[in-house]
């Protein structure tokens, strides 16, 4: 499977810039998700790689082939880029059986009957849809139609499989099942997958790397846990995670050492020990980012607040804690319920607390209430 490289790729419509100077490399056999809010440029990026949209400028390389170069006037057609595309709408032929839907494209590619039969059986077995061979799309469930669409896309052995929000039409239970199937399929096929979604849960669970985009600009391009634990900026920290990260304004009180400072946090003193050298002053616009799991509720905790709301979800419970005029989120394992305004004691733990200077991440570190 090929390596894909985008070099200074930009797409404009008039004065509107959909994708701004994007540089990224998709390595062989990676599962990449293009993630971001609606209108951020993720689908435009996918379409430019596929050749369905022409960039305003830049260069795109698939394998050893330059498929687009604005300076050289190169723009290879989608049909010659050897990619498979799976859309939100599965676009199955309603008058064709499952077998015919899968083989129709291979017939147009002039494959031999023997090769068509062998490949169709291979992908149907891979997707576990052999029993539906003679059924029509209307006789299948949404998940079964999804599998047929994937089988049809994989049948010609494309170098890369592109997917544009393919699970968005499914219910929550089926989406969960199909995430499992897609991840296993990626392993079984040894293919390169590029997947567009606005659902951060899909991105976190499926991807080997996440490309998070906002307003056409790449904000971070890293493995899911790196994006979660080491967000580049406030946008990334806020977009990834459910419940979202807690953000609390802080002021510098004292510089203890190059990697250690005392901060004023909700009217309390907080010792922050960073993993790298800090470069902050009294004028710095500081914000602490704390994931809900780093605020455990414990008797005798260093901080005290009151229960604003309790949101039990069976396996885990989200507790909204009011402390002064700030509402914080804490997540605990199991089912628990607090009365409104009940006193809650909690701590700050862990070494994944992020200190932001303005809109830039300064360092990851641990914090201790003094």
Predicted regions and their residues:
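Helix-to-loop junction immediately C-terminal to a conserved catalytic motif
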Residues: 50
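Conserved ABC transporter NBD signature motif
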Residues: 58-70
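ABC ATPase nucleotide-binding domains
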Residues: 81-84, 88, 92-235, 239
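Non-catalytic connector elements of ABC transporters
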Residues: 243-248, 252-370
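Conserved A-loop
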Residues: 11, 21-26
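The feature captures the beta-strand-to-loop junction immediately N-terminal to the Walker
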Residues: 35-37
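ABC ATPase nucleotide-binding domain
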Residues: 5, 25, 61, 345-347
């Amino acid at each position: 499977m090929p390596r894909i490289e985008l070099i200074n790729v930009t797409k404009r419509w008039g004065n509107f810039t959909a994708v701004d100077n994007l540089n990224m490399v998709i390595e062989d056999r990676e599962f990449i998700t293009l993630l971001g809010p609606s209108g951020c440029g993720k689908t435009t990026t996918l379409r430019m790689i596929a050749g369905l949209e022409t960039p305003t400028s830049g260069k795109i390389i698939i394998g050893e082939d330059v498929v687009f170069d604005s300076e050289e006037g190169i723009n290879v057609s989608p049909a010659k880029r050897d990619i498979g595309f799976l859309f939100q709408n599965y676009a199955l032929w309603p008058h064709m059986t499952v077998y015919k839907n899968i083989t129709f494209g291979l017939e147009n590619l002039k494959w031999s009957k023997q090769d068509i039969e062998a490949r169709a059986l291979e992908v149907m077995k891979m997707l576990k849809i052999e029993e539906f061979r003679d059924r029509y799309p209307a006789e299948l469930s949404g998940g079964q139609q999804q599998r047929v669409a994937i089988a049809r896309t994989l049948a010609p052995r494309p170098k890369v499989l592109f997917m544009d929000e393919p699970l968005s039409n499914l219910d929550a239970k089926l989406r969960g099942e199909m995430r499992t199937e897609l991840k296993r399929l990626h392993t079984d096929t040894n293919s390169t997958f590029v997947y567009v979604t606005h659902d951060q849960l899909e991105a976190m669970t499926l991807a080997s790397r996440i490309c998070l985009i906002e307003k056409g600009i790449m904000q971070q391009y890293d493995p899911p846990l790196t994006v979660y634990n080491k967000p580049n900026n406030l946008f990334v920290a806020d977009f990834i995670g459910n419940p979202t990260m807690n953000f609390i304004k802080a002021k510098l009180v004292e510089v203890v050492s190059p990697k250690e400072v005392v901060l004023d946090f909700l009217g309390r003193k907080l010792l922050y020990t960073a993993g790298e050298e800090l470069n902050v002053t009294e004028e710095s616009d500081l914000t602490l980012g704390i994931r809900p799991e780093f605020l455990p509720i414990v008797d005798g905790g260093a901080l005290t607040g009151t229960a604003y709301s309790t949101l039990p979800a069976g396996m885990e419970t989200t507790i909204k804690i009011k402390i002064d005029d700030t509402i914080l989120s804490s997540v605990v394992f199991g089912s628990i319920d607090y009365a409104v305004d009940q006193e809650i004691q909690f701590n700050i733990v862990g070494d994944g607390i992020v200190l932001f200077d303005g809109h830039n991440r300064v360092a990851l570190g641990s914090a201790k209430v003094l």
